[in-house]
């Protein structure tokens, strides 16, 4: 019940997953992952399937939990907003060689990664989705 309260689900202890929203299911999964007070929390595309507002809220929740519980966060994601909001250290893997091509802070890598593909990927974050005149 305490872990559910941490993720904003106090009062939903008796609900089934089908009875709550997608964002609430993600938060319930996070509470379940925290049940044994791990030192490391692993996330695999945590905001997949969420709308941008719910994704941002989940990012904020992950940061709050990291800070309050002192847990290390390891996350696999393609969501640029999440990378820049949560990450203080990133590792990029080459899809062909399966080797690390860059690692460091995402803002620094966006500017100066040796691998141009890493720079291009991270710079998409600053590119508007709709071009204006």
Language-model features, listed with the residues they occupy:
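Conserved ABC ATPase "signature" region
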Residues: 1-12
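Conserved ABC ATPase signature
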Residues: 16-20, 24
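A short, proline-enriched helix->beta-strand linker immediately N-terminal to the Walker B motif
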Residues: 35-39
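Catalytic Walker B motif of ABC-type/P-loop ATPase nucleotide-binding domains
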Residues: 41-44
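Helix N-cap at the start of a conserved alpha-helix in ABC-type nucleotide-binding domains
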Residues: 52-54
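Helical segment within the ABC ATPase nucleotide-binding domain
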Residues: 56-68
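Conserved beta-strand-loop-alpha-helix hinge in the C-terminal portion
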Residues: 96-122
């Amino acid at each position: 019940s305490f872990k559910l309260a941490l993720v904003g689900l106090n009062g939903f202890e008796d609900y089934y997953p089908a009875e709550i929203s997608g964002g609430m299911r993600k938060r319930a999964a996070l509470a379940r992952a925290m049940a044994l007070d791990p030192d490391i929390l692993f996330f695999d595309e945590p905001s997949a399937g969420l709308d941008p507002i719910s994704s941002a809220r989940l990012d904020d929740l992950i940061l709050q939990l990291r800070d309050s519980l002192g847990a290390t966060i390891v996350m696999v994601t393609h969501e640029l907003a999440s990378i820049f909001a949560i990450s203080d250290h990133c590792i990029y893997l080459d899809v062909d060689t399966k080797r690390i091509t860059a690692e460091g802070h995402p803002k620094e890598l966006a500017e100066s990664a040796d691998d141009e593909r890493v720079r291009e990927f991270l710079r998409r974050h600053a590119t508007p989705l709709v071009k204006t005149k």
